[in-house]
């Protein structure tokens, strides 16, 4: 039986108090943006839930697929709407039951939001259950483990009936928690960190450090693709690509080999701080995981963080690597992240990097050269791309154009 509405249940935003309206409006805006390319949809946001009406032109399954990726949504149900007339409600439930197979079981769950409705909850359950039993054969009631749970919600504007629930992404609507700058390396961890922070309602812009010719265009393409995957959930994301070769070569000239990783990370943060101020972000996000590599011990983090007063958010800091890999697979970034193209964090890696850097030595090595101008130059020569879910590089566009000419 074809449905004509989608019921969207809110996630954590239901815990908000006087500012709930702000969160509901932000979620509504995000839903409208996500569905704008699909014909036949109309979004109506209310305080406790959202309804999306569908016409025959709407691709209902595609609408559901997009909604499940939007942060702030707990779940989605395809629903059928009718009036508060008892006969109409019975007819709708009986029509739904025609999809039940012989031997299957059901139960009726009634939620009577409109307390002015003349029948109480249990009486309505009995009426509807009886109507289904009378109109079908070899179908029975099981209130504990039914094959179908027929949910009926009686509201002021009508009665909604449904049997399916699709799990949403949860979290808070993106845009309600400010903006951060995600340090996107191209590995497994940083895209997951970006997804986790977006789930808290935070909008991201991404920054990537590119060191040609030591890092290839394939490494850059990989980061673009990771950004594209992240954008599927939130819309267009700006990716800032930093020319990092000059800085990285100079670090390797003047800093002791065991300390080059520490200094590299410090210079990255210095550049990121400049970009953060330009774009109006409030924090830096990275995929660091405590103890995973030499630069991610507590002493290393302390030495690296010294160059900035900006808050640094580490959503993955306490997770096991297996948990991070699992999340990467779930969000669709894992297969891209493991492509064998080196980024600037893996080139020039010392054989024996220091895990507990002496802070005084870090300062001593870096004082041999004034990095200020080089840091500013890197920040001034950034390439900024706006990536959405349909993004194609100039190379891909040229390829498409060539194919069109040939065929």
Swiss-Prot record:
Keywords: ATP-binding, Cytoplasm, Nucleotide-binding, RNA-binding, Thiamine biosynthesis, Transferase, tRNA-binding. GO terms for cellular component: cytosol. One of its GO terms (biological process) is tRNA 4-thiouridine biosynthesis. InterPro entries: Rossmann-like_a/b/a_fold, ThiI_AANH, ThiI_fer, ThiI_N, THUMP_dom, THUMP_ThiI, tRNA_STrfase, tRNA_sulfurtransferase_ThiI. It catalyses: [ThiI sulfur-carrier protein]-S-sulfanyl-L-cysteine + a uridine in tRNA + 2 reduced [2Fe-2S]-[ferredoxin] + ATP + H(+) = [ThiI sulfur-carrier protein]-L-cysteine + a 4-thiouridine in tRNA + 2 oxidized [2Fe-2S]-[ferredoxin] + AMP + diphosphate; [ThiS sulfur-carrier protein]-C-terminal Gly-Gly-AMP + S-sulfanyl-L-cysteinyl-[cysteine desulfurase] + AH2 = [ThiS sulfur-carrier protein]-C-terminal-Gly-aminoethanethioate + L-cysteinyl-[cysteine desulfurase] + A + AMP + 2 H(+). SMART domains: THUMP (SM00981). It is found in: Cytoplasm. Belongs to the ThiI family. One of its GO terms (molecular function) is tRNA binding. Its main location: cytoplasm. This is Probable tRNA sulfurtransferase. It comes from Staphylococcus haemolyticus (strain JCSC1435). ATP binds at residues 183-184, 208-209, 265, 287, 296. Residues 61-165 form the THUMP domain. Pathway: Cofactor biosynthesis; thiamine diphosphate biosynthesis.
């Amino acid at each position: 039986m074809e449905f004509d509405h989608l019921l969207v249940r809110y996630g954590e935003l239901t815990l908000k108090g006087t500012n709930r309206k702000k969160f509901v409006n932000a979620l509504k805006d995000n839903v409208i943006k996500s569905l704008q390319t699909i014909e036949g949809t109309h979004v109506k946001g209310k305080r406790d839930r959202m309804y999306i009406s569908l016409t025959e032109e709407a691709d209902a399954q595609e609408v559901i697929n997009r909604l499940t990726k939007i942060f702030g949504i707990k779940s989605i149900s395809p629903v059928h709407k009718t009036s508060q007339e008892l006969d109409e409600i019975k007819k709708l439930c009986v029509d739904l039951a025609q999809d039940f197979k012989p031997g299957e079981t059901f139960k009726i769950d009634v939620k009577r939001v409109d307390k002015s409705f003349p029948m109480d909850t249990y009486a309505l359950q009995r009426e509807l259950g009886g109507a289904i039993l009378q109109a079908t054969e070899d179908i029975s009631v099981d209130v504990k483990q039914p094959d179908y749970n027929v949910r009926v919600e009686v509201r002021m504007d009508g009665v909604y009936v449904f049997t399916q629930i699709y799990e949403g992404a949860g979290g808070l609507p993106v845009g309600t928690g400010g903006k951060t700058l995600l340090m996107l390396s191209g590995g497994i961890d940083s895209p997951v960190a970006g997804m986790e922070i977006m789930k808290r309602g935070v909008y991201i812009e991404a920054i990537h450090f590119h060191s040609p010719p030591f890092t290839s265009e394939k490494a850059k393409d990989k980061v673009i693709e990771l950004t594209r995957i992240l954008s599927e959930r939130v819309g267009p994301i700006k990716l800032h690509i930093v020319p990092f070769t000059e800085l990285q070569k100079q670090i390797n000239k003047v800093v002791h080999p065991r300390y080059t990783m520490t200094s590299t990370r410090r210079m990255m943060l210095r550049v990121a701080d400049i970009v953060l101020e330009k774009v109006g972000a409030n924090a830096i996000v990275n995929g660091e995981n405590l103890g995973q590599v030499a630069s991610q011990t507590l002493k290393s983090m302390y030495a690296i963080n010294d160059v900035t007063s900006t808050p640094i958010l580490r959503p993955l800091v306490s997770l096991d690597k297996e948990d991070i890999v699992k999340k990467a697979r779930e969000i669709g970034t894992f297969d891209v992240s493991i492509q064998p193209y080196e980024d600037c964090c893996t080139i020039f890696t010392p054989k024996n990097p220091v895990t507990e850097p002496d802070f005084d030595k870090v300062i001593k090595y870096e004082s041999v050269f004034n990095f200020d101008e080089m840091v500013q130059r890197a920040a001034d020569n950034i390439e900024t791309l706006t990536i959405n879910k349909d993004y194609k590089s100039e190379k891909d566009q040229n390829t498409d154009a060539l194919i069109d000419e040939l065929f």
